Swiss-Prot record:
The keyword Iron applies. HAMAP family: Pep_deformylase. Removes the formyl group from the N-terminal Met of newly synthesized proteins. Requires at least a dipeptide for an efficient rate of reaction. N-terminal L-methionine is a prerequisite for activity but the enzyme has broad specificity at other positions. It comes from the Bacteria. Its EC number is 3.5.1.88. This is Peptide deformylase 1. NCBIfam families: PRK00150.1-3. Keywords: Hydrolase, Iron, Metal-binding, Protein biosynthesis. Its cofactor is Fe(2+). InterPro entries: Peptide_deformylase, Peptide_deformylase_sf. Belongs to the polypeptide deformylase family. Gene3D superfamilies: Peptide deformylase.
Amino acid sequence: MAVKEILRMGNPQLRKVSNVVDDASDELIISLIKDLQDTVKAHQGAGLAAPQIGVPLRVVLFGGGGPNPRYPEAPSIPQTLLINPVLTPIGSDLEDGWEGCLSVPGLRGKVSRWSRIHYRALNEDGFEVEHCLEGFPARVIQHECDHLDGVLFPDRLVDSASFGFTGELETAGIIEKLSSAEQKASQQSRAD
């Protein structure tokens, strides 16, 4: 149980399809869940998938219960851990939105995602859960589940012109800058 190194784009492990978890109560899974929680908190991510810390298993964690400094305009999402998630789009509506990724540091891009999604998975206690999400939470779960299939958000860009360094996109006014209060909160969280 520790903050793990996050693999970055270019590492071939990020391109592999992850294995199904056979036993959610296995000690390896319990330890993995704690590592995901510690790592996503330390890096202020909106979510994290097991392959991003070098574990090729179908486990994702998203949300954190409070505002996320990396996505200040987004609603808070309760922390949710899913094992072997299966996603099904609800309807045919797609929504374009800006994404970043802890495995693609410093870069953002516009990606089209289903606006509403239904998921079915096991929770950390091994019980089957299902839920419907829309908007930003639906985007986050789709992004994290892509990691389970070896897909990174740049693979899904609306167009290559929407992909760039966060600072450059902010300077050009393409995406909003973090407010000074949000920057301060972000810096304080990093110091903790």
